[in-house]
């Protein structure tokens, strides 16, 4: 089956966190169109079982295929950890996650071989980052810390709030004590807290933003497969966003962090089957 290189990229997440990945694709791959699905009716994924996350991911990928996408980005660390292998085996379309691109950069950047990973309970508990980092460099020691309150704080829009500062300081103290020199922001919500995390961890710690690294990895994948967009097909709304609930709240959040707002269309809630 011939894939149209000017077809859009499918991106999905449990909610608004994946917008950080969409933002980096918009910035770094300006010839690409995007169809985004935020599963806002079922957020968060971090507390759900592997079987449930695989089922949700299958439903969303089928929905994105109906939108004629040419590749899919699983812009959710939890879904990348639990569902990526299953959906790659099942669907005949290029699919990438957000874990491997960030881990590659962390392995290259660390000087003392002590790498921290923060994420949801599910992501950190999966051990997938540690497994991949150890594969890249067996000498690396990985310290994981689940930060379950970060997602609701971001979803509430409390990006620069004393409560968020206090919560972050408590979570990150353990990693400070472990003297990590590289920290993977292992949830797509977390780059929105980058300034808070930077303030606590200090300038000596390299903060790895998997959203940015994933956009670059996507660009390489598209070039390799001859699918890079040429940007010749004009479209009133090259960026289309779908959610399963709370479209107004999603729209307000998207408006606060995304560029090119005049090119974005956000649809009313839809439920993938």
Where are these regions (language model features)?
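Short "domain-exit" segments at the C-terminal end of structured domains
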Residues: 268-273
